[in-house]
Amino acid sequence: MSDLKAIQTRSLEMAEYFVAFCKKHDLLCYLCGGGAIGALRNKGFIPWDDDLDFFMPRKDYEKLAELWPQFADESYFLSKSHKDYVDRNLFITIRDKETTCIKPYQKDLYLPHGLALDVLPLDYYPKNPTERKKQVRWALIYSLFCAQTIPEKHGALMKWGSTILLGMTPKSLRYRIWKKAEKEMTKYGPADSDGITELCSGPGYMKKKYPIQAFEDNIFLPFAGTQMPIPVGYDAYLSTAFGDYMTPPPADKQVPHHDALIVDMDKSYTEYKGEYGA
């Protein structure tokens, strides 16, 4: 079995467990990005895709963080940054502790370096343009102080400003700033909003505005021999996010997007301790 096929097989096992957990605890979830496109275009993985990501409405997302440590299988670890633990992500990841997938940006961290399933929250997009500008500013502050890393792919100005801001802020204060930013950016509800947005997916996706109705429920579609949920308004979501999502990209773009230092679907990351930075 090729590395990519092995990763897809293990990712699907994780996704099936995750979806079953959400069903059991009445939590709404849906495949997003390439997983949702794959469900529609390929009835499974996009052939070169190497992971599955999920969206959840914010209230379900926060509930997941409470319920998972109590009721989930111990082989699946929910990683979410908090005051005493920073994993350099802006969102929840579910890690399979029986596998190895060590990312360069986490190589020096002491955490479960298993294959990850990303879970991203959806938030309301305020109607008022001034409030929307405030929301984006708070989301950028959240991104910097939650990840606590310098963004490398969003231009020299952002890199320079982030370096100064992080450098000037004591570690003891960073958590307070990030929690304040999180509170401010997520304070909007359906009454004062006319859309849904992604605040934890990076600056590009922060600009997106989707119809509220697109994420009111999910529908299940065939996916690699099982059934996976996608947003009920998948066309409005995917068209806004990706344009002509049913047309595959050029051949030179059909490559996995994620890098890793060590990948092993048969051995736990604990067997590789000492071979990477942590």
Question: Model-found features: residue ranges?
Answer:
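Conserved SAM-binding loop
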Residues: 64-66
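Short, His- and charge-rich active-site/binding loops that engage polyanionic ligands
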Residues: 136-138
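Conserved catalytic core of two-metal-ion nucleotidyltransferases
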Residues: 2-25, 68-127, 147-243, 248-278
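A short secondary-structure junction signal
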Residues: 129-134
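N-terminal beta-rich core of secreted/periplasmic extracellular enzymes
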Residues: 127, 140-141
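Active-site nucleotide-donor binding segment shared across nucleotidyl transfer reactions
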Residues: 19-52, 56, 61-62, 213, ...
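Short, surface-exposed, charged/polar-biased interaction segments
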Residues: 43, 50, 85, 140, ...
